[in-house]
């Protein structure tokens, strides 16, 4: 099945967040992890989501409707960008927190992880938060084309240890690596086909603390 994305609406404030009955999968990740590029790769369009070499480009919650299936992929603001103001980071944190807490149709959280980097604390915090709160987790390594095959394998193993044996998918927006596999996982997640990982022993369960951690 061939799917694409249509940008339906964008929310910059808490009041602009919308309530949808259709299943939703949130995309989360550090600033400059390649979320916008991945959205474009999924949509097979170059400029659906604006990309930038400057971290922190996505400062809103973007709702993309998946056609023809009808579920939504929701792109959340990137976290960990130290160059923006503290007030701006707090604003993003509240926006992310409100979305996750209030979204009754959230089917899972796709966390994007830079394949070039060892597991980062903010990413570990977010994946632990998802597992502790029984949010089905889909870990995705981005920029796989920037790493050698051995590096990809090593990074998958590192994350598997942290995620109870779950290896993340490897993707590359520029080459299309892993995009078809990612679509299969997203469809299954939207349909409720993936179960949540086992709860992490030391994972934070309080929403505001966890979200503040990853946006601080």
UniProtKB/Swiss-Prot annotation:
Residues 21-192 form the EngB-type G domain. Signal peptide: none annotated. The gene is engB. SUPFAM superfamilies: P-loop containing nucleoside triphosphate hydrolases (SSF52540). This is Probable GTP-binding protein EngB. Belongs to the TRAFAC class TrmE-Era-EngA-EngB-Septin-like GTPase superfamily. EngB GTPase family. Its cofactor is Mg(2+). PROSITE patterns: G_ENGB (PS51706). The lineage of its organism: Bacteria, Pseudomonadati, Thermodesulfobacteriota, Desulfovibrionia, Desulfovibrionales. Mg(2+) binds at residues 36, 58. Residues 196-216 have a biased composition (Acidic residues). NCBIfam families: GTPase_YsxC (TIGR03598). HAMAP family: GTPase_EngB. Disulfide bonds: none annotated. Necessary for normal cell division and for the maintenance of normal septation. GTP binds at residues 29-36, 56-60, 75-78, 142-145, 170-173. GO terms for biological process: division septum assembly. InterPro entries: G_ENGB_dom, GTP-bd, GTP-bd_ribosome_bio_YsxC, P-loop_NTPase. PANTHER family: ENGB-TYPE G DOMAIN-CONTAINING PROTEIN, MSS1/TRME-RELATED GTP-BINDING PROTEIN. GO terms for molecular function: GTP binding; metal ion binding. Keywords: Cell cycle, Cell division, GTP-binding, Magnesium, Metal-binding, Nucleotide-binding, Septation.
